Design a protein with these regions (language model features):
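Predominantly soluble domains enriched in secretory-pathway, periplasmic, or organellar proteins
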Residues: 1-248
Length: 248
């Protein structure tokens, strides 16, 4: 269904590879207008509008950019992911990755997009052209309890996405490095002799076991820990992504 929903307005390579207006491309504001479902591109030097266009319904207020500043990705609350070419002021592709979406994140290299969904309970990985690569049905490590995804963010130095789960006391880290080491699945008797089950490290989750639920979080400066809290818990926690558990 995700693949069938994909709309290509402008194929890759069909638009000019240079900006079509005069402005500092790295000094622009993207203004998401919540009331009337439009987006305005604002010149950061002159504080004047450059372009305004209609958006999908109820965009999330945090659009995500590719490293070169050319593309920006929007997520709507009803699951649509839109890719906008700032240089050409065009929506180039769209796909519906969920029914009730929390937010989206773009990888540090601009090649992947992760989408956090409340409905269905899923974490969707897309390529930069919005083709689905991996759809994770989100369940606990025992495969029993499903969960909504509260948020997903990019940990650029780790080459990974990190997601908080609403209904399971886990945080997931998903590497977008094709050379990521394999992930042990279950009990491992001997890592050296590979006695146990392993899954590919690329685009699969490593689970951190938590003391409480996470609704939202932020990274420490070295990106080795996340700090966050649940809305109902009344206290925060620190999760070490290498130790893969709560440490405080």
């Amino acid at each position: 269904e995700i693949r069938a929903s994909r709309i290509v307005h402008h194929a890759p390579g069909s638009l000019p590879d240079k900006p079509q207006f005069a402005a500092d491309m790295m000094n622009l504001f993207i203004v998401v207008e919540g009331g009337d479902h439009h987006v305005t591109i604002l010149d950061g030097d002159k504080l004047e509008p450059i372009h305004r266009f209609p958006s999908r319904y109820a965009l999330h207020g945090g659009p995500k950019f590719t490293p070169d500043g050319r593309y920006v990705f929007f997520a709507s609350r009803d699951g649509w992911i839109s890719k906008f070419d700032i240089w050409n002021l065009k929506v180039v592709a769209e796909v519906r990755a969920g029914i009730n979406t929390r937010n989206a994140a773009v990888s540090g290299d601009g090649k992947y997009v992760a989408v956090a969904n409340y409905l269905p309970h899923s974490l969707v990985i897309l390529d930069a052209e919005l083709n689905p690569l991996k759809i994770h049905a989100v369940r606990d490590r025992f495969g029993k309890q499903s969960s909504r995804v509260s948020a997903v963010y990019t940990a650029e130095p780790r080459r990974s996405f990190v997601a908080a789960l609403k209904d399971v006391m886990e945080a997931w880290e998903i590497s977008y490095d094709p050379k990521a080491p394999e992930i042990p699945a279950g009990m491992i008797h001997d890592f050296q002799y590979r006695e146990g089950a392993f899954i590919p490290g690329f685009l699969n989750p490593k689970r951190s076991i938590l003391d409480d639920y996470l609704d939202d979080f932020f990274f420490t400066q070295d990106y080795n820990e996340v700090m966050g809290a649940s809305r109902e818990g009344g206290k925060g926690q620190v999760v070490h992504l290498d130790v893969r558990r709560s440490i405080a």
